[in-house]
Amino acid sequence: MAVIAFIGLGQMGSPMASNLLKQGHQLSVFDVNPDAVQRLVDKGAQPASSPAQATIGAEFVITMLPNGDLVRSVLFGEQGVCETLSREALVIDMSTIHPLQTDNLIADMQSKGFSMMDVPIGRTSDNAITGTLLLLAGGTAEQVERATPVLMAMGNELVNTGGPGMGIRVKLINNYMSIALNALSAEAAVLCEALGLSFDVALKVMSGTAAGKGHFTTTWPNKVMKGDLSPAFMIDLAHKDLGIALDVANQLHVPMPLGAASREVYNLARAAGRGREDWSAILEQVRISAGLTANVKK
């Protein structure tokens, strides 16, 4: 079993640390909230008065903190991790922070001769409690292999995301999709209600279409990602249908800001001459708008 310093015992960190204890790992814990520390001490952890004290003798140092500035302070600040960190130890940041902060932290740790990887998590606090988190491992092959037994005490699925800093990048994209879709789904649900439509009926229909399953796993793999823009559903028709939905919403005084923004993306594609292409060609149009090279020639 490993000797671990765990720093950051919030809503996610506390149950994650608890699961490490359940698997027999030796934990030293630190948090600015003494009550959070005491709850882990009651379960068998050793309390620490600072990140530096927690790190003494640790093989792994896990940080689970609210933002990148705090991670930097914990690592490099007064009584920080680096004051007592062994050159053989591995630092694992599991916080959700800005990817560029992650890159800088890893580079700064490497410049001091230390090893660090990022492993942000997916799923919810309930999964943190049950030890069924999704672990997005960003590190070298050696780091991922070494950390896996410790990480799997906190989760049941580990994805090697392809190198240092890649974990937080895929977490960022996943959260962006989830959060934006949550708002778009709310617009659709309220429009259902305003139209007098049973939400259960709408849910049954959408669960079998791209609306419920998502384009990453339905339309895109079969069309644009194969280099095929022949229309299964034309952008012109998608634009028309979206316009009808927005017109109905306007008449019912239902705000649809995300839907309106989406229509402008389809307008852009039509202006670029893509109206008769498959609606998955939106991906290509957004790539071009971002200054990237199109993958599929028109």
Curated annotation (Swiss-Prot):
NCBIfam families: PRK15461.1. NAD(+) binds at residues 11-12, 31, 65, 96, 240. PROSITE patterns: 3_HYDROXYISOBUT_DH (PS00895). Reduces 3-sulfolactaldehyde (SLA) to 2,3-dihydroxypropane 1-sulfonate (DHPS). PANTHER family: 3-HYDROXYISOBUTYRATE DEHYDROGENASE, MITOCHONDRIAL, 3-HYDROXYISOBUTYRATE DEHYDROGENASE-RELATED. Belongs to the HIBADH-related family. 3-sulfolactaldehyde reductase subfamily. The active site is at residue 171. Pfam families: NAD_binding_11, NAD_binding_2. This is 3-sulfolactaldehyde reductase. Its EC number is 1.1.1.373. The gene is yihU. 2,3-dihydroxypropane-1-sulfonate binds at residues 123, 174-178. One of its GO terms (biological process) is 6-sulfoquinovose(1-) catabolic process. It is an enzyme of class 1 (oxidoreductase). Keywords: NAD, Oxidoreductase. One of its GO terms (molecular function) is NAD binding. It catalyses: (2S)-3-sulfopropanediol + NAD(+) = (2S)-3-sulfolactaldehyde + NADH + H(+).
